[in-house]
A protein has these predicted regions:
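An N-terminal assembly and electron-transfer interface module characteristic of large anaerobic redox
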Residues: 1-180
Length: 180
């Protein structure tokens, strides 16, 4: 007969019952691979140069689209790494406000990383509306920080100007793909 604990329902583990060896898949790891496991063009194949894309805010979800877009145009895509303390510290000098959210503060370090890589230009658009995933969704807009933080970067990361790195930061709407 099964012994049961009211709070955990795991009392039988101490009775020698075998542990389930088929753990649930790590969905975070799965998503990271689906979003970022793309092979960039080689330097020889990239006839138009290199574009840097920061792995930040809305660019996480939109990266497959932008990677494909720039690759088809003949650019080698350079993606900033996953966020770390070292990445955060790279951009600390250009953060203009203590009150902005931490994910936005991380953007500065990702931009600095891409500058250090010597890319031809950095692409970081302001995306007001994302693609509508469901007709039943009430909205598909980004928060004001996500939608406009590219302007903050343009105006506060002085290394962009000092190192003569072109910074492309158009405002786009992904809810009507034909407008891109």
């Amino acid at each position: 007969q099964r012994q049961m604990c009211k709070e955990t329902d795991r009392c039988e583990r101490g009775l020698g019952k075998e542990k389930n060896e088929n753990p649930a898949p790590n969905l975070y790891e799965y998503k990271r691979h689906r979003l970022f496991d793309y092979e960039p063009l080689t330097a020889e194949q990239a006839t138009r140069g290199t574009v840097g894309i920061p792995r930040v805010l809305n660019m996480w979800e939109d990266y497959p689209f932008w990677f494909t877009f720039f690759t088809k145009l003949g650019y080698r895509v350079v993606l900033s790494p996953y966020s770390t303390k070292a990445i955060f510290e790279k951009g600390m000098e250009s953060i203009p406000s203590e009150s902005v959210c931490y994910p936005a503060k991380l953007v500065h370090g990702h931009i600095m990383y891409l500058i250090e890589q010597g890319v031809d230009f950095i692409f970081y658009p302001g995306i007001v509306y994302e693609r509508r995933d469901s007709a039943a969704a009430d909205n598909n807009y980004n928060c004001p920080i996500v939608a406009s933080y590219n302007e903050n970067i343009k105006n506060n990361v002085e290394d962009l100007k000092e190192k003569n790195i072109k910074f492309m930061n158009p405002f786009l709407s992904l809810d009507k793909i034909e407008t891109i």
